[in-house]
């Protein structure tokens, strides 16, 4: 499987006309046991961070070996081994574990400080986390230096910081940098880079990456791959194909499935037709409990309220606004949502007072609206 993934990445990069010089850190460069004397005498970038030096199938053995070494090391040597363990975890996308190790390490030497910075930055970027107020700027990171995967890390930082211009400058060579990463990182990051290429309309790279997805069934069949195919079709103006594929992705449970439901709702609201709105209502209602918490749940409820309102179903719209207030009372949007709900309630009770609802339906609705 490891060779299959690597060959697939290389094939895609050849289609993208990535220079052969960036295809470094092939599996033959990996080492079972880190020889730091050799690394220190070699390329600095590999000394800072090289996730491909770890065997993709050797987590248990590598970890056992590193733990055994820890017992016999002291001082700077122990720090070095702990950073090796953090890098090992990162190579397998165990980012929480890698971050926990790094939090316990206090590097003393310039070389160790540099490596600690590179590892810490890599954990943040692979996790997709934006920098905090105390995070040093990326351009001071070892990952921004003379590395074959510099554009890869720069693109992840641009995505995390919403820097569209820097992302546009780095997205194309970032696919070359992706080839220097282990398969666990490729699986995790390929959808992120593909989405960036879609939004930047880098069609040649999008087409090649979508073909690569076809050779990785675990991604192609996942909601992420399905959603991104739909988004690519939508970006190219093929709304019918996009809607069909979005509906497939919306049947899942992860964040890409939620985003597919939101996309279906947005397309229906833009269309305005009753059939499209009813389809969006069904999609949103069917998945309203599939994702709880955070901005995605809030966005689903907001879209559902808008769809109800567009269909003239103000009672369900106001009840949905009530759900939002119950679920997210501390959000900044709470005050305008409450005002919107009060306005809709006034309209509903005015209509009820004017006899626009059958008496039995009005009584049942009134009971539902009671706090």
Provide a role label for each language-model segment:
Residues 1-35:
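Gram-negative bacterial Sec-dependent N-terminal signal peptides
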Residues 24-80:
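N-terminal leader/linker segments that initiate helical-solenoid repeat arrays
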Residues 33-40, 67-76, 103-111, 136-148, ...:
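Solenoid-like repeat scaffolds
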Residues 42-46, 76-82, 93, 109-117, ...:
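Generic helix N-cap/helix-start motif at coil->alpha-helix transitions
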Residues 53-64, 90-101, 122-135, 159-172, ...:
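Helix-turn-helix repeat elements of alpha-solenoid scaffolds
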Residues 67-133:
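Post-signal peptide N-terminal segment of secreted/secretory-pathway proteins
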Residues 87, 120-122, 156, 195, ...:
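Residue-level recognition of tetratricopeptide repeat
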Residues 106-112, 116-162, 166-169, 177:
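Glycine- and small hydrophobic-enriched segments that form the cores of compact globular domains
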